[in-house]
Amino acid sequence: FKENKNLIIGVAVAAVLVAFGIFAFQKWYYQPKAREAQQQLYPAEMAFKAESWETALNGDGNNLGIAQVIEDYGKATPAAAWFEAGICELQLGNYESAIDYLKNYKGKDAILKARSISCMGDAYVGLEDYAKALDCFVKAAGVIDNIYAAAYLLKAGVTAEQLGKNEEALKYYKTIKEQYPQSMEGYDIDKYISRLAK
């Protein structure tokens, strides 16, 4: 034991130093940077809520846009900023940039996560990559089990039809009818089913 005593003490001291280093990094570097990023985002988020996509993304000359905040603050930027930047790019028709931002969205909110995946699908539709779009819509529907899933299943069905996968599309439409009949999509789903059930 005496031979290993110094080794054990050294390992314990190193572990304490590493733990303190992580704590110090979080407390005195990361958290202040995250707060600053949040403050910088405020004007851009107001523009986002007003659907001023260009201003929200790139700023107005006086305030930073979401893209610049992400570039300046990196991982300290709130997760929602990646989602918002992706939506801005999607609305502006910049589909590849939208996909890049949306792939980097790491938020924990299931509804926003599903929506970000669905928006990636919309971007793939814009790029006419219907196979990837279909994968996104199906994945989005699998993230949540509520009426929002019906919208993603409808998109999956329409996209499957675009790919000539009518039986797969019918499966998505029937899922809406059976599991989400009270959703907006559920009210009109019979016309999609009857069109393919012939």
Predicted regions and their residues:
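Short solvent-exposed coil/turn linkers within tandem alpha-helical repeat scaffolds
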Residues: 69-79, 92, 106-114, 140-149, ...
